[in-house]
């Protein structure tokens, strides 16, 4: 048994080399600009969701695994860095339970095979203290070297805690100002074609049509800034995990074609808050959906996703999903459809 195990471990580098490339691959590669065509964007989990029982059957996988592209994904959101209380960003093996990050060479290999790779900042459990400009500056100073070393093509803002509006659309709250400080601070130090996407929950966007303040609509002035200045690639609003408001105070259940189209049309036509209108045209929308039942509330079957997509006759930029790993655990029925 010992000899068999030893032989197996000796074969692992050969197998890995055959499947995913070699350790001699280049460790630096150019920043890729915004994809010209349609995108299928998925979150790549840097932890093992199979080992912890969340989605058995497909856990952690190399970011350069060709099965990702084979099932349609051409934009990858690497989720998530650990952010310490002082704002220090970490991106390394073991920074959290079962976490393993891709090496710079593996990132280049995935990019050479067609992927555009963004770092997703935030998530439900990886927030940042937006009340402090000192914390914001510490985050900028520690995340930028990581973005450069690991050959990221952009950042995805997935902040889900700590962002609140001031109550006046024309006046930024401290947290809004500090999130803009972070985004501007990162973009200023990266190449001009470095990307920016955002993945807010609906409450932070269309929820502002009901009342503007606290979390409700708190992304709106930030979205407007980066739509207007041309730096936002697209918006990945999350069409899941709760009912969704339209532009007129109307409400729709997640997981329905009606809710999908109401949200999408609302963004395209514009949300007017206190006399200020925020628009996100169809070609800057990449709506977010759960890849599988269990990945998030409001799951839509492939047939329903197809109906929603076809309704726009190709006008949307693409679709986003949580997550690549969830999709792989259920035979890729999101990506393949």
Curated annotation (Swiss-Prot):
Biological processes, Gene Ontology terms: chitin catabolic process; polysaccharide catabolic process
Single Gene Ontology MF annotation: chitin binding
Keyword vocabulary terms for this entry: Carbohydrate metabolism, Chitin degradation, Chitin-binding, Glycoprotein, Glycosidase, Hydrolase, Polysaccharide degradation, Secreted, Signal, Virulence
Glycoprotein listed as a keyword: yes
Localisation per UniProt entry: Secreted
SMART domains, per the entry: Glyco_18
UniProt EC number: 3.2.1.14
Temperature optimum or stability note: Optimum temperature is 45-50 degrees Celsius.
Applied biotechnology: The antagonistic activity of Trichoderma harzianum is used for the control of several soil borne plant pathogenic fungi.
Record bears the keyword Hydrolase: yes
Signal peptide: 1-25
GO cellular component, as recorded: extracellular region
Glycosylation sites per record: 331
Active site per UniProt: 160
UniProt xrefs under PANTHER family: ENDOCHITINASE
Subunit structure, interactors included: Monomer.
Family: Belongs to the glycosyl hydrolase 18 family. Chitinase class V subfamily.
Physiological role: Secreted chitinase involved in the degradation of chitin, a component of the cell walls of fungi and exoskeletal elements of some animals (including worms and arthropods). Plays a morphogenetic role during apical growth, cell division and differentiation (cell wall morphogenesis). May be involved in the degradation and further assimilation of phytopathogenic fungi, namely mycoparasitism, the major mechanism accounting for the antagonistic activity against phytopathogenic fungi displayed by Trichoderma.
Protein name as catalogued: Endochitinase 37
Organism: Trichoderma harzianum (Hypocrea lixii)
């Amino acid at each position: 048994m010992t000899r068999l195990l030893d032989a197996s471990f000796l074969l692992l580098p050969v197998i890995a080399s055959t499947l995913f490339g070699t350790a001699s691959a280049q460790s630096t590669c150019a920043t890729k600009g915004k994809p010209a065509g349609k995108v299928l964007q998925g979150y790549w989990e840097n932890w093992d969701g199979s080992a912890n029982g969340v989605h058995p059957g497909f856990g952690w996988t190399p970011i350069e695994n060709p099965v990702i592209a084979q099932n349609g994904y051409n934009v990858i959101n690497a989720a998530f860095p650990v952010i310490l209380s002082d704002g220090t960003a970490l991106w390394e093996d073991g920074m959290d339970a079962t976490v393993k990050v891709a090496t710079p060479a593996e990132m280049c290999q995935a990019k050479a095979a067609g992927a555009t790779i963004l770092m997703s900042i935030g998530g439900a459990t990886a927030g940042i203290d937006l009340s402090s400009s000192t914390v914001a500056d510490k985050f900028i100073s520690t995340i930028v070297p990581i973005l450069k070393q690991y050959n990221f093509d952009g950042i995805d803002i997935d902040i889900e805690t700590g962002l609140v509006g001031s109550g006046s659309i024309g006046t930024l709250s401290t947290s809004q100002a500090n999130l803009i400080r972070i985004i501007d601070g990162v973009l200023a130090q990266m190449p001009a074609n470095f990307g920016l996407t955002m993945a807010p929950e609906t409450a932070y966007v269309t929820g502002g049509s009901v009342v503007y303040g606290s979390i409700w609509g708190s992304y709106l002035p930030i979205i407007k800034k980066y739509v207007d200045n041309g730096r936002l690639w697209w918006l990945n609003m999350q069409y899941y995990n709760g009912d969704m408001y339209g532009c007129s105070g109307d409400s729709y259940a997640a997981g329905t074609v009606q809710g999908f189209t109401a949200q999408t049309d609302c963004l395209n036509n514009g949300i007017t808050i206190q006399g200020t209108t925020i628009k996100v045209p169809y070609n800057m929308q990449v709506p977010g959906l759960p890849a599988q039942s269990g990945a998030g509330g409001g799951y839509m079957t492939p047939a329903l996703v197809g109906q929603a997509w076809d309704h726009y006759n190709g006008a949307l930029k693409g679709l986003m999903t949580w997550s690549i790993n969830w999709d792989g655990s259920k035979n890729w029925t999101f990506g393949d459809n």
